[in-house]
Amino acid sequence: MALVKLQTQHFRNLLSAPVEFSPSFNLLYGANGSGKTSVLEAIGYLGLGRSFRVSRHQAVVAHGQSKLTVFGALDSGLLAQESSEKVEHRIGISRDVSLKETQLRVDGEAVRSLSFLAMHLPVSVIDPGVFDIVAGGPGKRRQFLDWLVFHVEPSFSSLWQQVQRVTSQRNQMLRNGRLDESLMRVWDSQYGALAESLSDIRETVFQRFKIAFESVLAELDAPWVEGLKMDFYPGWDRSTALTEVLVNHREQERRMGHTLYGPNRADIRLKFGGRPVAETFSRGQQKTLVILMKIAQGKVLSDLGKQVTFLLDDINAELDVRHRVMLARNLQELRCQVFITSIEHPEPDTLWHDGDTPEYRMFHVEHGQLTEE
């Protein structure tokens, strides 16, 4: 699905006029504070149900207001059966921060879960913070993998929620001064069964991702390609049943007061020469690696017939021309939708040297208003 129309109300400084976008590339430029990043943020809000910049919903509501609305029209690019009209969907989210109420709609019908919006509009953000996928802790890489797992395997979301609930119960018991071992084993059994199922799904999707990543990596002419190793760690050594691991480390978990083994400790381990790439790779190499990982994500979904909307915020500040060209070329090959922001007026010829410039729309953003050029 491509976002072909966006309309917001009381979202930061954006004006409420509807804007139509290209299903291919959209180039937005403007001075700092003009609202160009807010456009990406609104698109992300529509697909993620939250801001990718801040954690508080109040922060994105326009000054003096208590409620925001983001609406989008999506185009699959496909024709409906027995019709010459394209398949379109309309999705929207309204959030009243004073009443703490959220309304979600898909094609005019109320839905209860943000997952319905996310399934219609898979959004992948590439901004300065994304490079923490390599340099940051395991949680960043779990989040990266689980985004893909969610869009590949429909059962993942409910299974993950069950794991979270059981983990919370175990943690409460571990923090209890007097531990009931018989009851703890009951929770261990539930946790172990759910963890095995969840890890099976993660492992399957990871292997699909790894194949896509290696195909993208093979096109890169860099000396470190051969020595790079990527593996999935499920959160414990699966040669031993998780329930046994939990019993063997009961005192350790009790001292720490929370669950130390299982899917909440999963990681994508990236190593070069036997050491973590966060310790061995330069900042530039880490950026290249993250870009390739993001492209591989998009490739997995593209191979499944799903289109990702990529949001590239101020990449000129983080990526040199070579990296920008590599990213633009790969995204063009995926035939996905892309939004790119910059301070300077974009020059498409610098991204597509060979003259194979894709369809695009260009917008100047000033005081929250988008003007197409």
Curated annotation (Swiss-Prot):
PROSITE patterns: RECF_1 (PS00617). The keyword ATP-binding applies. GO terms for biological process: DNA replication; DNA synthesis involved in DNA repair; double-strand break repair; SOS response. Keywords: ATP-binding, Cytoplasm, DNA damage, DNA repair, DNA replication, DNA-binding, Nucleotide-binding, SOS response. It holds the Pfam family SMC_N. One of its GO terms (molecular function) is single-stranded DNA binding. The keyword DNA damage applies. This is DNA replication and repair protein RecF. It comes from Marinobacter nauticus (strain ATCC 700491 / DSM 11845 / VT8).
